[in-house]
Amino acid sequence: ARCGLLTGMHTGHAQIRANDEMTARGDVWNHEAMLRDSTLEGQAPLKAGTPTLGSVMRQGGYRTAMIGKWGVGGPATESTPNKMGFDEYFGCICQRQAHCYYPPFLWENDRRIYLDNELLPPGTPLDEGADPLDPHSYDKYTQQTYSPDIMYDRVLRFVNENRERPFFLMWTTPIPHSPMQAPDEMVQYYVEKFGDEAPIEGKGYFPSRWPHATYAAMITYFDRQVGGLVAELKRLGIWDDTIIVVTSDNGPASNSCSSTEWFQSAHPFRSGKGWVKSS
């Protein structure tokens, strides 16, 4: 889907058909190894020179940026945002790294920017003997720097720095993809609205004490960010000259973390990511 969105190619003609992790490189699912060796980051790359939204807009005279998840190439390939038409990039090159909202680092163009978070590999379970009903059992899954916060700061910075000229920004926020992680004050707001609920193990991601409340908090968080961006565009006097498109890269997905049925995410349709048919 990311390949199709970036290149405009129909899925049947797209270069990338799946999340190819290129496992021949080594133990790509070992996050400690990936922290030590950046060549293990990233997924199957686009071919060098492939036209993208970024390159086409840059040729048209726009300053281009991508902020967020890349996932179609890695630092050691010819398919990085900067090589694929984006003047500026900030975010997570590798989609596996995006499976934690408190990562130890992000990428700024071609270099890592280290954050004040410790590595906590996705799939890390609760401590042995921890009570899954005790909110404090989940404390280790919340760290210092919430990556959507600093991505959003870069969004506002880019808009401000380029307010006097044409710009194209592709903001590929990881929200609301699993795992379920959101600022606690927003989570508690929905805990009060929804009431108590069963925790989840978060298979392959992280456990969550309040998965429905956390998912709702993530949606609200992103909604507020979009509202803040609109307000900033108006403050800068460029709102009337700006086009905003909000889209998803796939249908609703639970990923064993949030309930698409409970939220009626595809309503009035059934199913979700992968296929949808009318009810």
Where would I find each of the regions flagged by the language model?
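Formylglycine-dependent sulfatase
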Residues: 1-279
